[in-house]
Curated annotation (Swiss-Prot):
HAMAP family: ATP_synth_gamma_bact (MF_00815). F-type ATPases have 2 components, CF(1) - the catalytic core - and CF(0) - the membrane proton channel. CF(1) has five subunits: alpha(3), beta(3), gamma(1), delta(1), epsilon(1). CF(0) has four main subunits: a, b, b' and c. Keywords: ATP synthesis, CF(1), Chloroplast, Hydrogen ion transport, Ion transport, Membrane, Plastid, Thylakoid, Transit peptide, Transport. One of its GO terms (cellular component) is proton-transporting ATP synthase complex. This is ATP synthase gamma chain, chloroplastic. InterPro entries: ATP_synth_F1_ATPase_gsu, ATP_synth_F1_gsu, ATP_synth_F1_gsu_CS. Belongs to the ATPase gamma chain family. The active site is at C145. It is found in: Plastid, Chloroplast thylakoid membrane. PROSITE patterns: ATPASE_GAMMA. It comes from the Eukaryota. Residues 1-55 form a transit peptide. The gene is ATPC. Produces ATP from ADP in the presence of a proton gradient across the membrane. The gamma chain is believed to be important in regulating ATPase activity and the flow of protons through the CF(0) complex.
Amino acid sequence: MKFFCVAGLLASAAAFQAQPAAFTTYSPAVGGATSNVFSESSSPAHRNRRATIVMDGKANAIRDRITSVKNTKKITMAMKLVAAAKVRRAQDAVLATRPFSETLQSVFGGLIARMGGEALDLPLLTQREVSKVTLVVITGDRGLCGGYNSFMIKKAEARFNELKDQGVACDMVLIGKKGITYFQRRGYPIRKTFETGQNPDSKQALAISEELLNTYLSGESDAVELLYTKFISLIASSPSARTLIPFSASEITQQGDEVFQLTSSGGDFEVERTELEVAEPQDFPNDMIFEQDPIQIINSILPLYLNGQILRTLQESVASELAARMQSMQSASDNAGDLAKRLSTEYNRARQAAVTQEILEIVSGASALE
């Protein structure tokens, strides 16, 4: 076998010495003349001539992988832009609900101030001994959003175990497919599940608030806690927990709010957060006569307020999910670009190695004939 390999190499070298032009591809020179690859001519044909390089399987595999990585980068960039458009939509939805929310908060604050301590006897404002808690957990419906869902699930599990260690019974109301799938597979006590999608509306929030009110007023639960992801910026979000029911009159009348706005500059996205002023309680004169008893008015306002709070947290959770997806897709695009550069370098090295190997074979064959 070695003899045949050496004989083949010598035959190739002899053929190269006899007709070296046959081992190269070239373009015709001006006037139809041809030139040899070893010619010292400086004609355009000589400058445009390219040697035929036989690439090995490794180089071809690298080239195919470069193409695949570049196509993946295009997909991730498109997903980032889609997420940015949906964040703007969520932003507009939050701004659209602000006038009603501010007016409701102002009227409620005025009624609380007018009634004084009498309002604290309402069922939804009364603090009672807690023996069972309902956790409302908001997660996303899809993945590809970094640690958004996993952080929220870990927060819910930690709170569930904390209440269990304190001897407090606990069940869950789950919102979002990821959380539903996770907790159902692990056998957690689940009261009810909801799927709101990426465009939550007031009807969906109303269905959730009615379920929570019925649970609390019927005595099946002594407190309702809401776990959601607070939207901070495009690169940061915070799993948050708050007591949803019973209400705290002081929090309703004093707690501020924030509105986020997504802006773009030079192809980059930024978030501007504006802290809104607290809605001042409406001043009701002492001689004002209410057609209905103020207690009945407050009982009617509280479900509306709960509905608004749930809708707001749903919208904020959606914005956090989309922002996390934007950041995740941006990171994926950057990583794809870096990987494509490394693969291009590796491909060029493989190509250069193939050229060097061919030259060495030719030179070795020519030397063997001398």
